[in-house]
Amino acid sequence: MSIDRAAARQAVRASGERWLRTRADALHLQRGRRLARVLDLDVMTGRAGDARVRSRTLVLARDPRHPAAPAAACPPVPGERGILEDGTLWWWAPADPVLPGLTLTGDPDALAALLGTAPGRARLTWRGYRPRDRAVLAVEATGDDGVVARTFLKVLPPARAARVARRMAAAGAAGVPVPAVLAAPKHGVLALASVPGLPWRALLAGPEAAALDPARVAALLDLLPPVPEEPPGPAGTTAGAAGGADADAHADAGGPAVLLEHATWAAVVLDPEAQDEAAARADRLRAALAAGDPGPRVPVHGDLHPGNLHVDAAGERITGVLDADDLGMGHRVDDWAVLIAHLEAGAVDLGAGGAALRAVAARFRHHARTEVDEVALAARVALVLAALAAQPTAPRAVRSARRAAADAALARVGL
């Protein structure tokens, strides 16, 4: 089940616009079998003689498990947001019904007040957007002295933003190099300072990839503070850590089980002909997860992939940690699994040129085995690889290679 162009055209007509050209079209497959489609369009507004062409972003969202979306889930706004007859939600960004803070992007005065600058001195660049989940924008603001300062706005559902701010404050107080929160969250908007360095992911194709000692990552994880009053948040798109379970009895199986369900469903959406293969892999992963010991519950990051680790130019020293949104109590094996799986996926994506990165992944895997159960680690690495193989942006050949890597991860420990 997907969201086709016909639904998009209905939404454009319902908004009173005229569709001229498609500049980008992206499918999002989200936890809970939710779908979203984001289209960057050129549209014509107004009638002949008073018409103007502008670029806008249209979002369509559907939850197949609850097709009859109530109006409360997407309060209609004439010309900006509504619900189609089949229950598909639509809106023009930034009118996301779950992220009210996105309206800040169209209000120069409110943005200036948040950043402490004069109106009109801030330039916004969208860095990422998951409909009904979160958005990240980079802001370059020019001060009275002419100096340009870069900050980031993370836009979340308001209740979640308050929790994330508390988690980040706890992490910072414990010495974890997370971005500083520059102001109390308002309407779900967190203003965050930059962190030094560059994403480790940017170095993975070069010799600097081998410079980071796994012991430095272990030391970073040891700094993570317990946040007992805060259950882990919904894990990131590929995180294997706790997936938002509210009770310990469910947390051990809840996170991996949720990710497995998502990866299996998404694999079938993207490659329907591989349905039997996906079901067999899910059974194998389920058995592997049951065979390993995840270890004690400890503070976890929740989405520790190479893009969330900043390092110095040499790649030797960790200088920053991003997306501590999911900080909470979980299993250390999950943080290691997310990191190692991304390294292995990167090596697979590089093909014949991935030998050096495969060696880096092997080194991290060897270190992780000194801290956590190797069967639990292999099962979770394979699970995250299966999830990475179900990303809509990955070409078919890449999806197939990542699935093969998931199978190989299990085979290494005889699973």
List each language-model region with its residue ranges:
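Short, contiguous acidic/charged loop-to-helix segments that flank catalytic cores in large enzymes
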Residues: 156-159, 294-296, 324-330, 343-356
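Active-site acidic catalytic loop and adjacent metal/ATP-binding pocket
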Residues: 36, 135-139, 190, 287-334
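Residues forming the ATP-binding cleft of Hanks-type serine/threonine protein kinase domains
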Residues: 195
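Active-site activation/catalytic loop segments of kinase-like enzymes and analogous catalytic loops
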Residues: 335-369, 382-400
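Acyl-group handling in specialized metabolite and lipid biosynthesis
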Residues: 152-157, 202-211, 265-275
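Actinobacteria-biased recognition of intrinsically disordered, low-complexity terminal regions
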Residues: 1-2, 237-251, 316, 411-415
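Phosphate/pyrophosphate-binding loops and the adjoining catalytic core of nucleotide-dependent enzymes
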Residues: 1-188, 192, 200-201, 211-236, ...
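An alpha-helical support segment within catalytic cores of ATP-dependent transferases
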Residues: 106-126, 229-240, 246-301, 369-373
